[in-house]
Amino acid sequence: NPLYSTDETISNGFSHNAAENKTYYQLKLDYQREFDRHNVSAMVLFNRSSRAYDNRVEYRYQGISGRATYAYDNKYLTEFNIGYNGSENFAPGNRYGVFPAGSIGWVISREAFMKGTEKWLDNLKLRASFGLVGSDKISDNNDDRFAYLQFFQGGDGYSFGFNEFGSGYDGLKEGNFANPNLTWEKARKTNVGFDATLFNGKLTIAADYFREHRYDIITTLSDGDKMGYPDIVGKDAPFVNSGIVDNQGIDFELGWNSTIGKDFRYYIKPNFTFARNKIKFMNEVDYGNEYRQKTGRRLGEHFVYVVDHFVYDQAEADKLNAMNDGRGFQPWGELHPGDVVYKDLNQDGKIDDYGDRTHMGFPRTPEIQFGIPFGIQYKGFDVSVMFQGSLNSSILLNGAAVWDFPSYEQDQYGKVKHMHLNRWTEATKDVATYPRLTYGAYENNKNGNSSLFLYNANYIRLKNLEVGYSLPKNIIRFAGLQNVRFYVQGFKLTNIRQF
């Protein structure tokens, strides 16, 4: 073999083929009838699905659902749904869940006592819905499937001999603990709202109030500060149904579509959503410090050290480094002038993970989201614009986004960030908002998991802009064309934010 300068046969090759097969069965029965002012309908649906990917065990689901509706005079509306769904993720006996839901509606604008409003009120509908929904998602990790089964997995750390290629024969070890009682995560949802159309369709209004009570949340007690197993057990705690989270908020949309004269048309349709959640129960460790607890707080709040000040001079640095019998006030190395000093929240004379971190800022997911689409049209010209933004959100920056002179990000070598411009120096020590710049030694006191790098993530951006022109009909009709439009479109053209 001249390519490899050897006459030996090259073996031990590797090949891999993968295929995905999906199978879906559905049986559906529908019924619908109208008589006098009554309208009734019903539906029964059975479905079963399976998905096989590569050499994994098939994913399988099946269920039966039903729906019944009744309307009287297109004025009083009702609907009832029920689902009986089964998932492979749970043990027999816990595999199926029953999930009912219902809704009612009242088209109040059709009532006799609303007579006289039709001159300005086109439609007014009040509505409400309620229901129970379920989730069988355990995690995004395929290895977490069948969490109700105890299994064995390949061992590590010791080999029982070696094969001819030098690979060891590993043993087996018991996998993570199973939970045969694991079942569906559930959420009770309620929604009330109204829809209105006024002035011959020019003005539209839609408003909703929603509330969700989520319970039996599928989680593992090994996450964070939850009540898991001690290390001596040697295994992670199993997945369990534990946790309660409430969420509530409002949706609002307002639209106006009208004309000025014969040729000028315009529209605007702003929308707004506010949602806030609260952890009602979480099986977490009680450290005796309320500021550490997640129960009673919002999901996604940042758990950080709190910056107190920067070391003012060498005398202060020496004093802090001498604390705790020379081990120092903070565990990340010697402090120097300009370094960050964190707040001792539990007042034990030192900074540590268990007592000196707390929840700060807004959650990662915005609580407020809004959009402002609008546009105009004049003869053949048209312009459409979409602004979009969010409020009540915080982000914890890390890595190359904030650290001094990062050498591990290919496009960030030595780049100075805007927050570095207000760094600590002897001349700026009284007004600095960022610690001294360092590289190499003594840089660890800028802990990335701290309020120093917690930023307001509010933003508004010009998400979409489109400008177009349509050729006059009397020009293109000779070519047998119905419409010819030229346009220029841009996405994410500008962004206003703090960082």
Predicted segments, located by residue:
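Extracellular/periplasmic, surface-exposed regions of secreted and cell-surface proteins
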Residues: 1-304, 445, 449-499
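Conserved SET/PR-domain catalytic core that frames the SAM/AdoMet-binding pocket
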Residues: 269, 356, 366-380, 463-468
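Residues embedded in well-ordered regular secondary structure
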Residues: 10-21, 25, 31, 55, ...
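Extracytoplasmic gating/loop element in the C-terminal half of outer-membrane beta-barrel translocons
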Residues: 390-485, 489-490
